Structure formats: C-alpha cells, structure tokens
Amino acid sequence: MSYRIAMVCDFFFPQPGGVESHIYQLSTNLIDRGHKVIIITHAYEGRTGVRYLTNGLKVYHVPFFVIYRETTFPTVFSFFPIFRNIIIREQIEIVHGHGSLSSLCHEAIIHARSMGLRTVFTDHSLYGFADAGSILTNKLLKFTLSDVDHVICVSHTCKENTVLRASLDPLMVSVIPNAVVAENFRPLTQTEPLISPHDAKWLAPNQTIGPHDTITIVVISRLFYNKGTDLLIAAIPRICAAHPHVRFIIAGSGPKAIDVEQMLERNVLQDRVEMLGPVRHEEVRDVMVRGQIYLHPSLTEAFGTVIVEAASCGLYVVCTQVGGIPEVLPPHMTTFAKPEEDDIVAATSKAISLMRNGKIQTANFHDQVRMMYSWTDVAERTERVYKGISGSLSEEEFYGYSPGEGWSAARGRAGVQSFALIDRLKRYYGCGIWAGKLFCLCIVIDYLIFVFLELWAPKAGVDIVRDWPRKKPITTGEAHRDGGGITRKKNKRRREKRWEDLDRHA
C-alpha cells in the first residue's frame, strides 16, 4: 500500500546539514518504494516557489520570515491557509515533521490534526532541562506531541531524552537511526589522484605512516558553541605543540569562525591549520579523504551522521562521549573523550600514536559501514511506522502486545485516537495547570480557522495536481541495492532485452 506523505521542516537544502540530508535521502527512498512524497520548507535566497529535485521530489518553499539560524518566525495560525491548500492539492495522507526547533514542523502537525490527518514527528536533537530556552522548547514539544500518532528518534539516547521532555509513552516512540550513502563516501584509492596538490608533500593515499610523516586531522562542523568549537580552539595549539608533524583541516562556518582565526593568528598556526569555510555536501568526501583522523568535539549530539561518513571514508574517529554518539560506531573505529580540553588532547594524541604504530587498520572501515547503515533499511522501517499509524498493522504486531495490556491513555495517543475536537482537548488539557488551558484555547482557535477555510475556500474548489509518474514499488530482495538505493538488476534486464531486440532485427 502506497501513502502520500508531506515532510515538513524549516531545515532543508540548499542549507547543508544532517537533518537536511536525512529528509532528502528518506524522501527519495520512500519514492523508490512507490510512495508520493513532497517537502514543505521556507524560502531560501534564490530558492522560492516550487522546485523539483531528483526522482520527482517536489519541494514547496513557503515565503516566511526567518529569524534565527534558518528558523521561521512562529505565528501558530498564519501558516494554516497555505498549508491546507498544499495538503489538498497534493492529496496528502500523512504529515511527517522534523526537528524540535522547527516552527513549520510544530505548526504543520497541529494543523494536520485539525484536518484529520495522521502525523509523525522525528526528533534529531538532544536538549537539557535546566536553562530557560530548554524549558520553553520542552513545553512547546509537549504541546505538539500531545496529539501525534507516532514519534521517531535517531538514537536510544535521543528516545530517552524525548520521552522525558514531552512526557510520552515509550511504546509510541521508535528508534530509527540515520544512514549514509556509502558509495558517496569511499576511501581514496591508489589510482585516484590526490584532491589537492598541497597534500602530496604530506602523505600519499594508503601509504604506511612513518614517524616523520604528517598526519592530517579533519574537522567538518558548523562552528557553533554546541558543536564544541571552544574545545577545538583550546585543543589545537596543544596538539600542534605536542606533535610537530600534525596538521588540521577545518571546514565549516558559523559565529565561532572568527575565534578560530584569532587562535591561529595568536599561536602562528596558519601554515598548519587550513580553514576551508563552508563546503557543499557533495564536497565533504573530497575533504575527508585528505586526512587520516576525524575529530568531532561536539558537546551534544543525538546521532552524529558526519562520523559515520568519516568512517566510511576510511578515517579513524576521535569524538566526545556525549548523547547518542557511543551508539553509532563500534569501538575499533573510535576513540572516545570526555567533553573537556585535557581529555580531547589526550584522546587525539592516543589516536596519533596508534596510527603511527600501525595498530589501526582502516582498510575495512568502508565495507563495515556499508553493511551497518543503509537508507533503504531506514525507509523500510519508516514505512512500517506509517503502516502502524494508518491501521495496516495490528496493535499487537506494531506495538508488541495485545490491545488492553498497556496503558489505555498511551493507546489513545498511539495512532488509534479520535480526531474529535473534545477528545483532542482532553489530551492538551493535561499539559499543565495554565499551559493546558492555553493550549486548548489555541486548538479551538485553530479548529475555528479550519472551519472558516472550509466555508471560504471549499475543498472542491482546490485544483488537484497531477502526480509525477510513479515507479513500480521496490520490495526487499527484489534487486541488489547500494547505500543510495540504486537498482542495478533492473538496468541489466533492460540491456539484455535491448540486445535481444537488436539480434531479432538483425
């Protein structure tokens, strides 16, 4: 059974990032499986209106005011008219929102429930409980997820965090990790030329590292506080002082870029640290293969897709032991450090020593990562969630027990709840003494706007768009796939048929 799905998030291409890549790869693989998928995001500079991407993936760039880090200004209700128009035009059945800090995501889930649509939310981040910003974010998340069909988290640590923040039943939260297109992140081969002539004097690809050969440490990250840029600034001078044959390549942009440049000038390290600035996602592999070690000093991370990409490129990973990072890669691919300056320096020095002593063999990293992570598998598991919330799977099959064995309130929030306004208000009313009443007021106003739109612009008067020609759904085991979901067997059959036709005419 195929579904019509709308992915909604503030964060999407052309902005690079893990959430953006996740949405794109998941959408294209769901299209390969026979579903219709559209993406709703805000307008970017040079990207407005409706755009088509690979495989007929349609992207709606909604003109909304951006306030901070590509997040739109939260208006609660003003998004409803254009959202309703898109949903009706595309005949959407499931609305899938991404990101706790995405205003479009939260508003889309609320409006979708008012329209009687099934909703799914994917959380990609970890947040605390103490500071004012986290408290407000968690309250907003609890508001939105009080009436959602299912929640997906990218790691078990992220699941625990989301369950606590939004007061959810753990049974209605699934863990589906991110993945990588392994074919796009291959190690540098012997026959492949060096990416940069500057690297030729440092180390040729696959060459044994001697005591005086230079080891290159790669860092690819947004230069923000939560990405551990302050730790990086403190650790680089100490690492360079302790290891004279070590250089750094830093790719990324952000408000901390000025601090990094000041550190380089203060310590006269311009000849040993190369700043590349922002790089496109398709250029990430070309940067990674220039090094032997990948350093990831993040202070908080739900999954860390970039370290999977680095391991796939054959780099040994040094990362902080925070959030869901310990779940991502096996121990022989990583060295963990506490999010402290001394520990970062010690862990990096340990990795350098292991590389020089030949105790780390990275030749098989790519094949191992390809076996562990696949977007095809992620799409299959996400499709199972869609089947569960739409009723195609029984509760016993989807949740793991017979109806009536679990908490009844959770069952009411886990995909079988009523769309009736009174039932929705009961769920929102339990969000707090004052917050519950405020949330109920917002939902009542939202429902009144929906009724007004139904009268003012009836559904029958909205033109239905023609669908992009769909592919035949690809089932598991039908053909050999690589990490990007490319089918090879089908192309082989087409070539054989073409050869048979040519022989027949000859």
Question: Residue locations for each model-derived region?
Answer:
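N-terminal subdomain of nucleotide-sugar transferases
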Residues: 1-47, 51, 55-58, 376, ...
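Aromatic "clamp/platform" in nucleotide-sugar-dependent glycosyltransferases that forms part
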Residues: 299
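Carbohydrate-associated surface elements
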Residues: 43, 157, 179
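Nucleotide-activated donor-binding/catalytic signature segment of Leloir-type glycosyltransferases, i.e.
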Residues: 261-279
